[in-house]
A protein has these predicted regions:
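Hydrophobic ligand-binding cavity/cleft-lining segments
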Residues: 1-51, 55
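Glycine-rich portal/gate segments that line the openings of hydrophobic small-molecule binding cavities
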Residues: 45-92, 145-150
Length: 152
């Protein structure tokens, strides 16, 4: 099961997985796994020396390519609640604001993995409608499919 909604500065994606939250969260707590969950068209590359496990206040530097333009991005882990949720916030990158909450909710089928993003862009509604929304749909659809492959 997969649900995706993107509307003017907010994105919501949920994926039902057959594994429980502790196993799924463990995968997410290794920043090297970001590469696995990121579509190749973004040309994602981690630039930071990473710890074994992500923790509160960690900063992760990486580079992506948006429309063939290389962009440096730095995220900071601002919430870390093991097996339940964490939040990464862009502190350097292409958005005016990017706050990405990852939730893991156990249920009778395993766990529901939820991505909630609140974002603001520099050039407003038209750029969001023409470019950002479509790219986020591609990114989160890829991510949901990859999570299903790994945990179903």
């Amino acid at each position: 099961m997969f649900e995706l909604k993107i509307d003017q500065g907010e994105s919501y994606c949920s994926t039902q997985l057959s594994k429980k939250s502790d196993e799924v969260f463990e995968f997410f707590s290794d920043a090297n796994n970001l590469q696995i969950l990121t579509p190749s068209f973004l040309k994602f590359k981690i630039l930071s020396n990473l710890p074994d496990k992500i923790k509160l206040n960690d900063k992760i530097d990486y580079r992506i390519s948006l429309r063939h333009i290389p962009i440096k991005w730095r995220s900071k882990i601002t919430v870390w609640d093991p097996n339940k949720r964490f939040v990464d916030e862009q502190i350097l990158g292409p958005y005016r604001q990017w706050v990405h909450e990852h939730l893991f909710i156990d249920n009778e089928h395993g766990c529901l993995a939820i991505d909630k993003v609140k974002y603001k862009i520099w050039f407003g509604f038209i750029v969001d409608k023409l470019f950002v929304k479509k790219e986020l749909e591609r990114i989160f659809s890829f991510r949901a499919n990859k999570l299903s492959e790994l945990f179903n």
